Swiss-Prot record:
GO terms for molecular function: ATP binding; ATP-dependent protein folding chaperone; isomerase activity; unfolded protein binding. It is found in: Cytoplasm. The gene is groEL. Its main location: cytoplasm. Keywords: ATP-binding, Chaperone, Cytoplasm, Isomerase, Nucleotide-binding. HAMAP family: CH60 (MF_00600). ATP binds at T29, L30, G31, P32, D86, G87, T88, T89, T90, G413, D492. It holds the Pfam family Cpn60_TCP1. NCBIfam families: GroEL, PRK00013.1, PRK12849.1, PRK12850.1, PRK12851.1. Together with its co-chaperonin GroES, plays an essential role in assisting protein folding. The GroEL-GroES system forms a nano-cage that allows encapsulation of the non-native substrate proteins and provides a physical environment optimized to promote and accelerate protein folding. Belongs to the chaperonin (HSP60) family. It comes from Dehalococcoides mccartyi (strain ATCC BAA-2100 / JCM 16839 / KCTC 5957 / BAV1). This is Chaperonin GroEL. InterPro entries: Chaperonin_Cpn60_CS, Cpn60/GroEL, Cpn60/GroEL/TCP-1, GroEL-like_apical_dom_sf, GROEL-like_equatorial_sf, TCP-1-like_intermed_sf. It catalyses: ATP + H2O + a folded polypeptide = ADP + phosphate + an unfolded polypeptide.
């Protein structure tokens, strides 16, 4: 296909238009008084949502070059979401500010590569300062505060805190849709392991890039499945029992994987293939744990069994299995409670006997997976649109809470970034590198400015007041007051703030040193025939 190419100033104009279009759409959601955005769906009612990354993922621009700018900024939000689960709108706001300020300086004659160096040095200093300013999460009340701010609902804050109190900070928590009208929690047998789906073709929820399998039948094996010949006899047997199949194997590849994908796409089989966790003997032990939890048996090469020997008794069952690219969660396995207790006793005995610290740690992980179970938060609402919006807020609140526990917290509402600004004074740079630092300095006020603007205030006035306030003091947009942010319960996870800054700067640096764009020339679709052409050949 023929290509269209643009250079220099045209590149910056196109990228800026794309960046601004996406960022202007998303930034209205920032803060407690942010406004939601309605997303059109191919079927059903529009989704009304205030989650930055979800909105960004839905945006595609008609102009190919402008769309490149939008997609690059979208990448900042996606990376932040993957790393910290929150802060996606902040990362987009920061990226837009960095890019626009950098383009102004490039137009005035600044050298892009030197601006990039200055931005990188400023961000490195800020990250170190954010870590210094961070304080650990203390007690359940601060967990409530973090979850409440991100979820924008005290009920969500208390819900997350209660669940984490029961399953522990590393416990497995899943979020489901419910037919009820309120939030409900339950604790079920289950486990989570650090392996995801083998192919993205198994995804059932493209928005979250997850594969969700209800009433799952599970085939577990320590074999590598490569050919159709070894897979087909087992599939034919299983299809007589269930159409919802999850295969957990050492690997599924080559023509075997292609066969599963084709059958999935054609709708012949609702299937998910997942790599087995661990390696060697540990993999065998974890597969056995999984089999006991789900009431099945492992098709083991050590026992001389092949896939075609599978029987109904070998298949495990679970109410629900959720898998993404990194991890898989088995919820409500149908294994015998007595067998699970016996397995836990066996692992405890191994922990007491082992002398290896590494082996002990891995055994404790297996024990925790079987003992801890899975907490399930069911989200209900009066309409499907409201339920999806609520579910997204609960997911964001859970991710932010985990981030806060891991790296600590900072004053919220954009105050954490402003408090870190003085560290840039220690950077003794010259020329365009110093300009790069000033670009970052200007960009860091944007989150506070947009939180205030979305609350109906003059953003610049609010920024000046916060800058002149004591450290840790900021603007509470919810109640329209200034004060100590921590005392008011307005706190942000350090990981969220750091990730938003880091990813925004990374994408901005890519954009500002880009000097040419290449895109396909879109062919115009042929005009539809007129009425007089009907029936002609």
């Amino acid at each position: 296909m023929a290509k269209q190419i643009i250079f220099g100033e045209k590149v910056r104009v196109s990228l800026k238009k794309g960046v601004d279009t996406l960022a202007n759409t998303v930034r209205v959601t920032l803060g407690p008084k942010g406004h939601p955005v309605a997303l059109e769906r191919k079927w059903g009612a529009p989704t009304v949502i205030d989650d930055g990354v979800t909105i960004a993922r839905d945006i595609e621009l008609p102009d190919a070059f402008e769309n490149m700018g939008a997609q690059l900024v979208k990448e900042a939000a996606t990376r932040t979401s993957d790393a910290a689960g929150d802060g996606t709108t902040t990362s987009i706001v920061l990226a837009q500010a960095l890019i626009n300020e950098a383009f102004k300086n490039i137009a005035a004659g600044a050298e892009p590569i030197n601006l990039k160096r200055g931005i990188e040095k400023a961000v490195a200093a800020l990250k170190a300062q954010l870590r210094k300013n961070s304080t650990p999460v203390k007690g359940k009340q601060q967990i409530v505060q973090v979850a409440t701010i991100t979820g924008k609902d005290p009920e969500i804050g208390n819900l997350i805190a209660d669940v984490m109190d029961k399953v522990g900070k590393d416990g497995v928590i899943t979020i489901e849709e419910s037919r009820g009208l309120r939030y409900e929690t339950s604790y079920v047998e289950g486990m989570q392991f650090d392996r995801g789906y083998i192919s993205a073709y198994f995804v059932t929820d493209p928005g979250r890039m997850e594969s969700v399998m209800e009433d799952a039948t599970i085939l577990m094996t320590d074999r590598k499945i490569e050919t159709v010949a070894e897979l087909l006899p087992a599939l034919e047997k299983i299809l007589q029992i269930s159409k919802n199949l999850v295969i957990v194997a050492e690997n599924v590849e080559a023509e075997a994987l292609a066969t599963l994908v084709v059958n999935k796409l054609r709708g012949n089989l609702n299937i998910l293939a997942v790599k087995a966790p661990g390696y060697g003997d540990r993999q065998k032990a974890m597969l056995e744990d999984m089999a006991i939890l789900t009431g099945g048996h492992v098709i083991s090469k050590e026992a001389g069994r092949k896939l075609d020997s599978v029987t109904e008794a070998d298949l495990g069952h679970a109410r629900r299995i959720v898998s993404n690219k990194d991890k898989t969660t088995i919820i409500d396995g149908e294994g015998s409670a007595e067998a699970i207790k016996d397995r836990i006793k066996q692992i405890k005995a191994q922990i007491e006997e082992t002398e290896s610290a590494f082996d002990r740690e891995k055994l404790q992980e297996r024990q925790a997976a079987l003992v801890g179970g899975v907490a399930v938060i069911a989200v209900g609402a009066a309409t499907e649109t409201e339920m999806k919006e609520r579910k997204a807020r609960v997911e964001d609140a859970l991710a932010a809470t985990r981030a806060a526990i891991e790296e600590g917290i900072l004053p919220g509402g954009g105050t954490g970034l402003l408090n870190a600004l003085p560290c840039l004074d220690a950077l003794k740079l010259e020329g365009d590198e110093a300009t790069g630092v000033n670009i970052v300095r200007k960009a860091l006020i944007e989150p506070v400015r947009w939180i205030a603007t979305n609350a109906g205030k003059d953003g610049n006035v609010i920024v000046d007041k916060v800058k002149n306030s004591p450290v840790g003091h900021g603007y509470n947009a919810e109640n329209d007051v200034f004060g100590d942010m921590a005392e008011m319960g307005i706190i942000d996870p350090t990981m969220v703030v750091r990730s938003a800054l880091e990813n925004a700067a990374s994408i901005a640096n890519m954009v500002l040193i880009t000097d040419s764009l290449v895109a396909d020339i879109q062919e115009k679709a042929p005009a539809a025939p007129g009425p007089e052409a009907a029936g002609m050949y």
